Amino acid sequence: IATFDADMIPQHTFLMKTVPYFLLSRFAKENGKWRLKKEEEVDKKFRLGLIQTPQSFYNPDLFQFNLYAEGNIPNEQDFFSREVNTMRNTSNAIAYTGSNTVILREAMEEIGGFPLKTITEDFETSLRIQKAGFITYATDEIQAAGLTTTTIKSMIRQRVRWARGIIQSLQNTHAIATPRLPLLARLTYLNTFLYWWSFFNRLIFVMSPILFALFDYRIVNSHFWDVIVFWLPAYFFYSMSMRYLSSNVRNQRWSQIIDTIFMPYLIVPVLLETFHIHQRKFKVTNKKKEGKGIGFEFAVFAIPHVILLALSAAAMIRFVHGKYGWALFYSSIILFWIIHNMVSLFYAIFFMLGRPAYRNSERIRAEEDITIQYKALTYEARTADVSENGLAFWSEKPIYLPENKTVEFVITTSHYKARLEGKIVYVKEQDKGWRYSAAIRAVDEENKRQYMQIIYDRTHSLPMQMDLWVTAYDDMLRNIKKRLKQPFKDKRKMPRIPMERQITFTNGAACRLVDFNYCYFSVSDFNTNGSQDDTFIYNTESGIPLVLKRTGIYIRHSSEELLSVVNLDDLTGKNIINQILVDIKNTDEKEG
């Protein structure tokens, strides 16, 4: 039985990467080849009940998006899916996360189907399968991807459901105490339970220096050197263990930031659920994209963090007031503690501020062969990224594709082929080439299906590991700059190609060609040679006649005039429009 969330899209290799696990007990590998075991060789005790592949998402999660970190950190859920869950294989205590999974029907029948008295039926299903004596296994190879939640409200609601549901399931199955699970599995589930109480620990960690520095309330009675001896080694080894165990998917700083963000909203639900005050209603996570940025969510959800930040600032000011020399030195532990917490609180406030979303569909990096056609013109290029409503491709040379005209695109991969049509919406010079962006749609339903497969039948292009060179200072500076920067929409739909050469027209008039974009020439130092005409003809090296007309439009402080290409449609129909660039470039080289 394969299960997927409604928004999850499996890759074409999903079944081939998961189903063979269920056959391992019946096959043996000898001399590099697999053979079917004899009946007496089969281990009857080996019963694989579930294979869990990682949860993966093709859109940035809120930590990546709201903090402008989609190029620096992986999805927040990657740490559990690709690191924690796979490590739980050793204790046979992996968590079924509800999607991207294959379950043995026999195992489902033995436990009586999905449990109903919990709001995390997926987690409890894997727990009951393990209690029934089956092996469960988590892999680290991504085989499906979907949408992660895009609003703070829905993310918090999702985490509350996970917290309450997991505690419900642990209570329903007595997982921590049952003798039907091995000791390692029970310890793993004890750790699972304690994790949800870590948010209460986080609150104590944030409030302790505030209570001491601002209200003179002492949480722990210790001397400066006692703290150094006990705290500093613990801090160091915790940081090292996070770095060693997480494979650069998560570090201590980001763990504390994430816990600080969720802290105010998980303490009460965890407390209620622990004392059997249950939530029974399953609330579906909203994944509809919203692009409002700062608004209601900030005003509501940032309040606890703003209060804690204000208290921390007040505590720091009061604590350092009047201290000098050794007194200030011995106060450094408390100051470091407060500042350390304030950094996480600043992250939380930036997170709650949100960020405007300008795209309706996610853009996924994909390098595939693409053929572009317009009338008699045909070009070969490579896609840069694709989305449901648009695509971008990269060309080594600037090519002519008319503005506001329908262009045909054919994308070909090793498995799919899609014919699309659309219009160029943006062109810019990039990476020693030219990037073209287009708004597109499929020509029919079959091509739409093929195009959807091209987009989603791939591993997403978001980071899989952290950029360890990015510090908290870098994050803060980036957030401030991005939030102060006014959005600018470049509307250029044709390539502007610099020329800088002198040309002479057939009537003796001359000018300096500054640049052109196939539709217009920008010229300076125009000498009409006494002609009163506003139309001029220039013959290129190949003898192509360019009929240019003065528009009366001046740019760049009136130092340059625009000349329109009158016979553009004729040049396009004869498929010689691109030869113009070649001729002018060749002339440049000869003159050089």
Language model region names:
Residues I119-T125:
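Acidic donor-binding loop at a coil-to-helix junction in glycosyltransferase catalytic cores
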Residues R128-A144:
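Catalytic donor-sugar/metal-binding loop of nucleotide-sugar-dependent glycosyltransferases
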Residues Y195-R280, F296-R355:
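Membrane-embedded multi-pass helical conduit in multi-pass membrane proteins
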Residues G390-S395, K428-A442, Y520-D525, R556-D569:
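Short, solvent-exposed secondary-structure boundary/capping segments
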